[in-house]
């Protein structure tokens, strides 16, 4: 599986950067359109990797995205949870690059390079990583029952 992921590294980086460009700021209603765009991005990704059931659930707050792949109904369920929203990037003057224009930089802490963008670490990067790991498991017919739930972290739902 590691070799497969390494072979698709550039493709995966491009996809992650695409997701990170979406300013899905949950605390500001003027970004509600971006929250919906991010939810649809996750929905599309789950469908593309082969989930059997993918749905966007509308809530009084922001949408919840759910996807599952069931291969063996008798196996335990694994639930992967994450959120696709981000906090406002203020104060902007503390950013060395625009928060929704991801860049890969080498630093003393990350000599191999790291992505700098709002949401790269909390939590779009992790959601993306789980979707891609799930994709590899589906390709190898490995998941017994796996469910992915993503939501806006601040919907209070």
PLM features: what roles do these ranges have?
Residues 34, 40, 46, 67, ...:
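Alpha-helix boundary/interfacial micro-motifs
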């Amino acid at each position: 599986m590691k070799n497969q992921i390494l072979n698709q590294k550039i493709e995966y980086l491009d996809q992650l950067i695409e997701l990170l460009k979406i300013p899905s700021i949950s605390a500001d209603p003027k970004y509600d359109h971006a929250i919906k765009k991010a939810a649809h991005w996750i929905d599309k990704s789950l469908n593309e990797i082969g989930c059997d059931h993918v749905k966007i659930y509308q809530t009084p707050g922001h949408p919840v995205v759910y996807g599952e792949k069931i291969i063996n109904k008798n196996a335990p369920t694994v639930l992967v949870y994450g959120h696709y929203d981000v906090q406002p990037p203020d104060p902007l003057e503390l950013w060395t690059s625009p928060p929704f224009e991801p860049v890969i930089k080498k630093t003393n802490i990350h000599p191999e390079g790291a992505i700098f963008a709002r949401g790269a670490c909390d939590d779009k990067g992790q959601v993306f990583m789980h979707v891609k790991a799930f994709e590899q498991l589906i390709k190898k017919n490995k998941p017994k029952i796996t469910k992915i739930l993503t939501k806006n972290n601040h919907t209070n739902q």
